[in-house]
Design a protein with these regions (language model features):
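Exported/periplasmic ABC-transporter solute-binding proteins
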Residues: 6-36, 40, 54, 58-62, ...
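Conserved beta-strand core positions
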Residues: 18, 44-46, 98
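Short secondary-structure junction motifs
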Residues: 41-45, 88, 182
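A short, gly/pro- and small-residue-rich
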Residues: 83-90
Length: 238
């Protein structure tokens, strides 16, 4: 599933629209980054297209009009890069790690990965081709915990919604999602020995008609200002 959003509501016939395909977990920081970038680059509108990294990689492979692609994992960026669809090598611009999320108030008193194996607990994730689903499987394997998920959501936002609404008891998401939830769910830390480092690469699509603006957007994210913005939303610097 792909969600599209403009970073600002201003309209101008002279504007260049920069199509940024970004992982769902980047929704909030990229929305703010888009607004900040537009202020520094009059005449450029940042159009965010959000979805699971696996879906976005497939869209780019199928010729979608993307200028920039930001993935929540290296594997999906590699799919694009291996087909020579990038203008230059991708770069890591942020990292993330995982947390368990539970319904506000933690009614089932979940405190560890082992608690997630309770057969009466409703656990949701995504398919393993979506980065958060793949990372979740890696974490559970490290911890020696076996779980049969009750449902598979299309992306990390789906996991958040299911748990926040009480339709599910628990899930595993990025730390940045817990920050963005602003108290709608509770986060439970996963020990470092079981956790992973999710690397977020970004690349410019080779057939972009706006290479200059695309490079400027990437440079903005890598700048101290862009990195501070990402950190504000729970991401780590690479």
């Amino acid at each position: 599933m792909l969600f599209s959003a403009c970073a600002s509501s201003s309209e101008s016939q002279e504007q260049t629209t920069l199509e940024v395909y970004a992982a769902s977990s980047l929704a909030m920081p990229f929305a703010e980054a888009g607004v900040a970038f537009e202020k520094e680059h009059p005449g450029v509108k940042v159009q965010l297209n959000l979805g699971a990294s696996s879906d976005l990689a497939r869209f780019v492979q199928e010729g979608a009009p993307a200028d920039v692609f930001a993935s929540a994992d290296v594997a999906n960026m590699d799919k694009v890069e291996s087909q020579d669809l990038l203008d230059s090598a991708s770069v890591i611009f942020a990292t993330n790690y995982l947390e368990i999320i539970v319904e506000k108030g933690n009614p089932l008193n979940i405190s560890s990965l082992k608690d997630l194996s309770n057969p009466d607990l409703i656990f949701v994730t995504t398919n393993p081709d979506v980065p958060i689903g793949k990372y979740t499987a890696e974490v559970l394997k490290k911890a020696g915990v076996s779980i049969t998920p009750d449902s598979f959501e299309s992306n990390v936002k789906g996991i958040m919604l299911k748990v926040a609404s009480g339709e599910a008891d628990a899930g595993i998401v990025y730390h940045s999602e817990v920050i963005a939830a602003d108290g709608q769910v509770e986060g439970i830390k996963i020990p470092t020995e079981f956790n992973i480092v999710a690397k977020y690469p970004i690349g410019i699509i080779k057939n972009t008609a706006h290479r200059k603006q695309a490079q400027e957007f990437v440079d903005f994210l890598l700048s101290p200002k862009g990195q501070a913005l990402l950190t504000q939303y729970g991401f780590k610097t690479p």
